[in-house]
Amino acid sequence: MKRSKTLRAADAKVDREKLYAPLEAVRLAKETSTTKFDATVEVAFRLGVDPRKADQMVRGTVNLPHGTGKTARVLVFATGDRAAAAEAAGADIVGDDELINEIAKGNRLNEFDAVVATPDLMGKVGRLGRVLGPRGLMPNPKTGTVTMDVAKAVTDIKGGKIEFRVDKHSNLHFIIGKVSFSDEQLVENYAAALDEIVRLKPSAAKGRYIKKAALSTTMGPGIQLDSNRTRNLLVEEDPAAV
């Protein structure tokens, strides 16, 4: 009952009819965070695209300037010097045929958050699509995860580079940090994600592109964002600055 009252009190602070400026939303999200741990801050977008059509797929990567607050665990499929370079760059798991077989059997799937592969191994890694695909972990040249420069890929991912892909319901989800981040850090991470989504707008997409955006913390209420606001995001309420 006590927990329920806490959640209801947090929910009551959010105006469901209002579209909040990003800075105001971040401050409200922190105020309404109810967890005792350092909660994750997430943004969800609803896009005006049909992901069933190849020319309306939205997929890419973005380097969050302040990271997500969590260091990603990276698995790399590589051999020889490339494998050594991946290990030196901080890859958590490195291997080739034996590792591919392990993953194919569904083993170790909870030990990594991102996957990188060299092009020469993609013929073998390709058969992992059934296992990695549904988890959004399949290496892809378009996102820089199929590359000979595995060291750079590992460094980028651990430095805050995240991969995203619109789901079948036309939604995109981003973790933009932790409640412990400063307001400015969270807004700047949000801005980086928003800029990349706007940049990747498919030419085939008609009508309003970003239909809805909402920010929330772990177990916190959803806060509707003014998705038309794409500039001067660190200004809270000055309409002239929008």
From Swiss-Prot:
Any GO molecular function: tRNA binding
Top-level taxon in the UniProt lineage: Bacteria
InterPro entries associated with the record: Ribosom_uL1_bac-type, Ribosomal_uL1, Ribosomal_uL1-like, Ribosomal_uL1/biogenesis, Ribosomal_uL1_3-a/b-sand, Ribosomal_uL1_CS
One term under GO cellular component: large ribosomal subunit
Annotated signal sequence range: none
CDD domains named in the record: Ribosomal_L1 (cd00403)
Record keywords, A-Z: Repressor, Ribonucleoprotein, Ribosomal protein, RNA-binding, rRNA-binding, Translation regulation, tRNA-binding
Entry-linked SUPFAM superfamilies: Ribosomal protein L1
Listed GO biological process terms: regulation of translation; translation
Family: Belongs to the universal ribosomal protein uL1 family.
Function: Binds directly to 23S rRNA. The L1 stalk is quite mobile in the ribosome, and is involved in E site tRNA release.
Entries under PANTHER family matching the protein: 54S RIBOSOMAL PROTEIN L1, MITOCHONDRIAL, LARGE RIBOSOMAL SUBUNIT PROTEIN UL1M
Subunit structure: Part of the 50S ribosomal subunit.
Name used for this protein in its record: Large ribosomal subunit protein uL1
Taxonomic source organism: Streptomyces sp. (strain FRI-5)
